[in-house]
């Protein structure tokens, strides 16, 4: 089962927590969930070049707090904070409430599965050899402290007539071990031959304590490729 299921979903409530953190009654739940989907769609569309790995949405009383995890916070903020103010207004139009946007810098993008997958997809679109792109990503992750990494690429790789899947793995990636801190990311490369899918699993070590916030705490300490210091509060 661990081989098939999304590793993040399998570990929710054990050593991972949800990206949407709020409670709503029966009548409000659908509306707020739809707002979350819209917010993420708009932010990913507006911040294509900002290397956004994760968007966390929290809803304290009559407010909406959005935390953007990005490897390029300067692109998100813009000149003198102009871009982040525009984003705050767009999110406020969706939620009809006060919006606070925080930026969290990812110090080691090579250890973030989503950013690694997007990087490989972009290289495939630029016609870089898929084996070279995969090997380079594996070497970078292992050099920066990952205990294991696995990368799958599928589709008409290299313009082949028949679609196939190629994968590389180095180190350990224990998908069945619930205490394992495994990051997972997916991206799609739109090439002239069709679409190619990229999947990345990165094993960063084991979390022995039962703590849903453990992964966030490790990112805050800089151990998981992130830093929780907000670069700007747009409230």
Swiss-Prot record:
InterPro entries documented for this protein: KH_dom, KH_dom-like_a/b, KH_dom_type_2, KH_sf_prok-type, Ribosomal_S3_C_sf, Ribosomal_uS3_bac-typ, Ribosomal_uS3_C, Ribosomal_uS3_CS
GO molecular function annotations of the record: mRNA binding; rRNA binding; structural constituent of ribosome
Domain KH type-2: 39-107
Entries under SUPFAM superfamilies matching the protein: Prokaryotic type KH domain (KH-domain type II), Ribosomal protein S3 C-terminal domain
GO cellular component: cytosolic small ribosomal subunit
Region (Disordered): 215-235
GO biological processes: translation
Keywords noted in UniProt: Ribonucleoprotein, Ribosomal protein, RNA-binding, rRNA-binding
A Pfam family this chain is assigned to: Ribosomal_S3_C
Highest taxon listed in the record's lineage: Bacteria
Role of this protein: Binds the lower part of the 30S subunit head. Binds mRNA in the 70S ribosome, positioning it for translation.
Quaternary structure annotation from Swiss-Prot or TrEMBL: Part of the 30S ribosomal subunit. Forms a tight complex with proteins S10 and S14.
Protein family: Belongs to the universal ribosomal protein uS3 family.
Protein name: Small ribosomal subunit protein uS3
Gene designation: rpsC
């Amino acid at each position: 089962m661990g081989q098939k299921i999304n590793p993040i979903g399998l570990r929710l409530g054990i050593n991972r927590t949800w990206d949407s953190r709020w409670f709503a009654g029966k009548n409000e739940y659908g509306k707020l969930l739809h707002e979350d989907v819209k917010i993420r769609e708009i932010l990913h569309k507006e911040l294509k070049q900002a290397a956004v790995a994760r968007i966390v949405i929290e809803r304290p009383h009559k407010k909406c707090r959005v935390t953007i995890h990005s490897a390029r916070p300067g692109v998100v903020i813009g000149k003198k904070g102009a871009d982040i103010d525009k984003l705050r207004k767009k999110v406020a139009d969706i939620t009809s409430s006060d919006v606070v946007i925080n930026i969290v810098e990812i110090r080691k993008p090579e250890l973030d599965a989503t950013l690694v997958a997007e990087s490989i997809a972009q290289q495939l679109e630029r016609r870089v050899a898929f084996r070279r792109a995969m090997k380079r990503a594996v070497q970078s992750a292992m050099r920066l402290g990952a205990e294991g990494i696995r990368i799958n690429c599928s589709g008409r790789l290299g313009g082949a007539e028949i679609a196939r899947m190629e994968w590389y793995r180095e180190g350990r990636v224990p998908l069945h071990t619930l205490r394992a801190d495994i990051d997972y990311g997916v991206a799609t490369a739109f090439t002239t031959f069709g679409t190619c899918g990229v999947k990345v699993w990165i094993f960063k070590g084991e979390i022995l304590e039962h703590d849903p916030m453990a992964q966030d705490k490790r990112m805050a300490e800089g151990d998981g490729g992130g830093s929780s210091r907000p670069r700007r509060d747009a409230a």
